[in-house]
């Protein structure tokens, strides 16, 4: 693989060569401008209003300038692509430290969602919350939040997330990633007041629905921003950091809830304090995001090339000519990728995600990939405290188990970073599902026994499930859903995929509530059989349909999908996404300077088209 320094040196040599050519010969554009001036004296229009159109680049006497320029830009893009693919991790960190830092900052917004969704499930096991909002179970003598309200509260925040995700698409199109995130943080800070001053489950439902809207925004933009602002060598780490933020949020929630159980067991602060702590995040995050660079991919799609260049400069370390050349080559690569996608369709709408076979396949894979987080039984982990209580452990022990579980999840995500150097995306996804299935079947078997040891064993194995989930499918999904879509449709595809997840999550939540609640199905640990089966079904889909994207740049992934390469052959298939563009450049019919030159003429407020004969 060609090194980054040699790549920059070749670029310098080409620039020096062009300067020599300009000094030793007459520039073709200058020659033609003289000719145009002579023609203007004989014509009726004012040459001061003449504008060149997109195709009006004039070749030199050898008829080589246009192909050379196109081929050079394509070569720069290809070399930048090769450099990105072969860049070691430490080189990437030294070259893009600012990009990594900005990505970490933006992804930290997900801590809030992981925190709030975790405390909601933990409230169902908190005695003061149960007595305040629950009803007495005549069979057990304990207070419980009814299944209907548990389902309703879950549906409310998921409905809010669906609405928020759909609003994110047009908002990003209009104002970009940064200002959309800042606006979402502002609204979240306002909506938390409803939760803090709640007087009934109805108020909590309204607060959850409204808070779900900014959470939906965070779900989409953290992943897309990380994938677009960082190079391939950092992409897995910074997209899967989203999962780490979820785990941190859940761990914070478990620690806060254990504190509430110990210190505020009979006080409203037991649930008000966890709500109030959410105000810690919005202001500092909004200030940080305000100073973050906008995604250069979004800026190029909007035609703001100069701003995209400045954004790239802010993500790279170093200074001087070498940095400028690296920025130029990276910009060429982004423009080439987007131009190739735009040739397939001029617009980037939700309909484009499904209207043709290529994008329909990519959207399907992204949706089913994220749905896998539901169908693998991971939602049972979110209700772990409630599950542990139903398994027969004390409330205090249940909260302790939850803390251990989330710590294991964080450790597993870090291990997945190490494993990603040796395993592909598909490998982590598939092996994680296989191990989860085994653990769930064992949990189901233990659920058939009423002994204390069996109950404790099922609770301990749920921690093992959480470990394998956060080692495999949980983090890798965040990377896959950012790599599978085209750059032009990335935000919209992620929105559709996450909303597919949210819709299925509604069904999964209802099932879990019925499986665990003593007044309904009361399956308890036996629900492991159910989720073990769904893990195997999800694994079967992955084997057939989920491609391996590890080590592939965005433009390579585009080409693999364009060629219709089967999922299991993605890893071994070699492609040259620049070959077609090179061929097109070589076939350009360059006109002789003596032939007609078509230009666009703007004459005194009206547009006309003229052919100037030289």
UniProtKB/Swiss-Prot annotation:
SUPFAM superfamilies: MFS general substrate transporter. One of its GO terms (biological process) is maltose metabolic process. Induction: By maltose and maltotriose. Repressed by glucose. The keyword Membrane applies. Residues 130-144, 202, 258-272, 386-398, 449-460, 515-526 are extracellular. The keyword Transport applies. Residues 1-48, 595-614 are annotated as: Disordered. Pfam families: Sugar_tr. The chain crosses the membrane at residues 109-129, 145-165, 181-201, 203-223, 237-257, 273-293, 365-385, 399-419, 428-448, 461-481, 494-514, 527-547. It comes from the Eukaryota. This is Maltose permease MAL31. The gene is MAL31.
